[in-house]
């Protein structure tokens, strides 16, 4: 693939597409094609690139009272797509800890947990991905699902998207046994500068000009709260300090209808894992 990364600690940024379903009966996947992993020795952060740029510009565009203080930065916010995943996952490998920040609406829901090492069973199967990465297959039961990964031994970085890690190389493709989720590596590059870890961490801790409702729990509790919010919009509104409200949508023919306050959602860590 024309990229050589040494094991002595260069920073890298890997771009992934994330495919997921909200209902197991669905045939088509929803896609987030701009997920990023920034890795450096001791830590990593997994985030969405569009959300990162919108957050960075928001910090410039607004003052501490939420008023627009930089019109140029404010206009640039709209150059990046809305609807991108706002969730962020931080891993501290040296402390064996992780933190996920879920950010629906004006809510910052932080879940903290102990990082488990997946017991990867390495196989003899190898292949070359469509992007030209030579990879080897491994499997493990991890966080309530059976995961299959293909990792790249030529990139000696024991990391991957989300909370997937611990293989003897960067994870290039990962999916669960039900194929509800897929992560696919698009490209990887060495960084001449530091990762975005500190910048994203600072924003999550003190966003400029944004009034947020912050909740911090152990991961099991945070997942329960998050999953309920994703399935019940009335509950999400209440967590954001708002009264439940009806949302009206208009179709292409001009017909309006009230959007359901409930929706399907499948979490990466299944509900039953925490029971």
Where are these regions (language model features)?
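Bacterial N-terminal signal peptides
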Residues: 1-4
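Extracellular or lumenal secretory-pathway regions
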Residues: 8-120, 125-127, 134, 148, ...
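Glycine- and acidic-residue-rich phosphate-binding/metal-coordinating active-site segment common to enzymes
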Residues: 122-185
């Amino acid at each position: 693939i024309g990229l050589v990364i040494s094991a002595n600690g260069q920073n890298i940024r890997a771009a992934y597409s994330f495919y997921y379903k909200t209902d197991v009966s669905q045939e088509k996947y929803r896609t987030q094609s701009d997920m990023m992993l920034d890795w450096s020795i001791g830590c990593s952060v997994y985030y969405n690139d569009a959300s990162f740029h919108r957050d960075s510009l928001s910090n410039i565009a607004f003052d501490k009272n939420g008023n627009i203080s930089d019109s140029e930065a404010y206009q640039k916010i709209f150059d990046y797509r809305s609807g991108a995943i706002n969730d962020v996952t931080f891993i501290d490998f040296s402390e064996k800890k992780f933190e996920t920040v879920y950010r629906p609406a004006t809510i910052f829901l932080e879940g903290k947990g102990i990082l488990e090492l997946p017991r990867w069973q390495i196989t003899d199967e190898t292949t070359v991905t469509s992007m030209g990465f030579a990879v080897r297959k491994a499997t493990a039961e991890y966080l309530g699902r059976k995961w299959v990964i293909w990792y790249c031994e030529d990139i000696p970085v024991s990391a991957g998207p989300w909370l997937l890690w611990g293989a003897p190389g960067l994870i290039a493709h990962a999916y669960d046994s039900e194929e509800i989720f897929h992560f696919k590596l698009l490209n990887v590059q060495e960084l001449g500068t530091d990762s975005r870890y500190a910048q994203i961490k600072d924003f999550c801790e003190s966003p400029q000009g944004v009034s947020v409702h912050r909740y911090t729990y152990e991961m099991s509790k945070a997942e329960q709260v998050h999953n309920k919010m994703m399935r019940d919009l009335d509950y999400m509104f209440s967590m954001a300090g708002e009264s439940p409200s009806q949302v009206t949508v208009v179709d292409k023919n001009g017909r309006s209808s009230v959007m359901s306050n409930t929706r399907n959602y499948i979490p990466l860590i299944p509900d039953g894992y925490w029971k």
